Regions:
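Rossmann-like AdoMet
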Residues: 1-58
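Conserved alpha-helix/loop element of class I SAM-dependent methyltransferases that forms part
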Residues: 60-73, 197-201
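C-terminal substrate-binding/active-site "lid" region of AdoMet-derived donor-dependent transferases
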Residues: 175-277
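S-adenosyl-L-methionine
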Residues: 119-165
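Conserved SAM-binding motif I beta-strand of class I
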Residues: 100-117
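Short SAM/SAH-binding signature in class I
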Residues: 158-173, 179
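Conserved SAM-dependent methyltransferase scaffold
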Residues: 86-90
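Conserved class I S-adenosyl-L-methionine
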Residues: 73-83
Length: 277
């Protein structure tokens, strides 16, 4: 996968923000600070179990997410970890739903975002930020996370996942201190550990060709998933964004999957597929 497969043209972040009216979703006061990613020089800032303060929005990440959802005409999105991303994803899905040229495709969760989180508090905070016009798009799911194994490798699994077939999976949760239990004394609840969610691996065989997975950071987790995926995935890591992308490139499963690929991704999907054959 090349970066141009995801972003055919360079994004003017501030122009995109204004043209898509995202400032009203995120908050003009927040946006006026900076669009670029901010970093904290304290190496323990993001791995402090006592730090309950939600991370501030990273506008460049949010704008790229919005762009990808619209560009790929995504209809069903699965998100791990709620926040500002939930609102931005829902807005992009809502705008996709306004397309008057949508063909009749087989999709039981058409134009829905399903967001999973381990914190009822963060779910409630996000709910309060959602504009009324997007409330029917977002479906929140609370679930605990448990230390587990995948093919004998220690990892974490959510106790419950929404029963959907997503076009895009965005992974930005859970944090490493949420999982309960341990496997032979090992858990992620240590500042030197890292998140290691494996739910995608357990559901891989259900995912349809054309599915895109995005890991926001979480490099160790993304590498674990990459080394255990079994189907024909195209992979890209973009250091500038610190994001990992996986696209499932396979021939369509049948006429219904093909019809959806043709509408959402177009002929360029088959060009990418042919590169892997």
């Amino acid at each position: 996968m090349n970066i141009s497969d995801l972003f055919p043209e360079k994004i003017d972040y501030r122009k995109y923000l204004i043209n898509n009216k995202l400032e009203s979703l995120i908050g003009k006061n927040e946006i006026s600070k900076t669009i670029k990613k901010t970093t904290n020089k304290n190496p323990f800032h993001n791995v402090n179990p006592k730090n309950n303060e939600p991370l501030p929005p990273e506008f460049d990440d949010l704008i790229r997410l919005h762009f990808i959802i619209k560009k790929r005409k995504a209809t069903t999105v699965l998100e791990y970890g709620v926040g500002y991303s939930s609102i931005v994803l829902a807005d992009a899905i809502f705008k996709n739903s306004q397309d008057n040229s949508i063909p009749k495709i087989r999709c039981s969760n058409l134009f829905e975002l399903h967001s999973v989180d381990t914190s009822k508090e963060y779910i409630n905070i996000t709910k309060k930020r959602i504009p009324k016009r997007l409330s029917s798009i977002i479906n929140f799911h609370f679930s605990n996370v448990t230390m587990s194994e995948f093919n004998g490798r220690i990892c974490t699994l959510f106790d419950s996942n929404p029963n959907i077939s997503p076009d895009i999976i965005y992974v930005d949760g859970p944090d490493q201190f949420s999982p309960t239990g341990d496997i032979r004394g090992i858990s992620t609840r240590h500042s030197d550990r890292m998140p290691m969610v494996a739910d995608i691996l357990s559901m891989e065989h259900f995912l349809c060709p054309g599915t895109l997975i995005i890991f926001d950071g979480r490099t160790a987790n993304a590498r674990f998933v990459k080394s255990n995926l079994q189907r024909n995935w195209s992979y890209l890591y973009v250091e500038e964004f610190d994001q990992h992308f996986f696209e499932l490139l396979e021939t369509p499963l049948g006429e219904h999957n093909k019809k959806k690929i043709d509408y959402c991704l177009g002929e360029y999907y088959y060009e990418r597929l042919n590169r892997t054959i």
